[in-house]
């Protein structure tokens, strides 16, 4: 018994040292990858592509009569659960932008589709850079994957919303016990959805095998940070509305940009955690932790910068 107790006491410092080494390596890794710069780049691309993405999504849903009212429900759900405060202003701006896209020609519609593909492509490149993936997917495979996301994604989202609406309309929810469970489920639904989305993102996007447990840990950290930032950002907007005095009617634009930037920063932090968990051999409690990073970073950085230049030009 004393031997067991003593071995536990010896194990605790080792675990603490491993945790400290991991945190130091993670911080060095995030600084090395400049995730704050990459988050700003992705936020910029997202703002250029958010209307095309919503337009493509809603236009695909409109082709199916069963999803007739799903578009408005989807917009309201996203605004109410994933955009903190000022949701009405952002919702009105997006509605106006999307309404104007209905007047576009076929050439304009093609441009919207290309812009949506550009967003997915840049997400793919940034996450693969974090995982130090040197071997790129073949162009045909990448295009097929992006096309599947843009076509099947809206259908799956619409089907889930339609199924939820059908379940809500059932008389089973008249029971007080079931109604309480359903209310609790709705309260946790944004967290569950964001966690599931992060797990899928960290498992499927990198062009290498990612351990499921590592993806779950990174996704849970990202989901918690997302919920905390949502509450903190909403509190800042409501308690310190100085931005309205400066920007006036245009206040929704900087609000949306800052929020999108925070979202991408959280996504990249979760990706860094997931990738670092799979690099245990680099958790060294030395002063120069950055030396333990892979040696192909310079080439990857050049490739990423070259891809960004090509996409922007």
From Swiss-Prot:
Record region (Disordered): 293-313
Protein's UniProt keywords contain Cell inner membrane: yes
Entry's localization field: Cell inner membrane
Major location category of this protein: membrane
Key word Membrane present: yes
Assigned keywords, A-Z: Cell inner membrane, Cell membrane, Membrane, Transmembrane, Transmembrane helix
Transmembrane segments: 41-61, 104-124, 139-159, 185-205, 215-235, 249-269
Comp. bias intervals (Basic and acidic residues): 299-313
GO CC aspect terms: plasma membrane
Membrane-topology annotation of the record: Multi-pass membrane protein
Superkingdom of origin: Bacteria
InterPro entries, alphabetized: UPF0761_bac, Virul_fac_BrkB
Family to which the UniProt record says this protein belongs: Belongs to the UPF0761 family.
Record-given protein name: UPF0761 membrane protein VV0203
Lineage: Bacteria, Pseudomonadati, Pseudomonadota, Gammaproteobacteria, Vibrionales
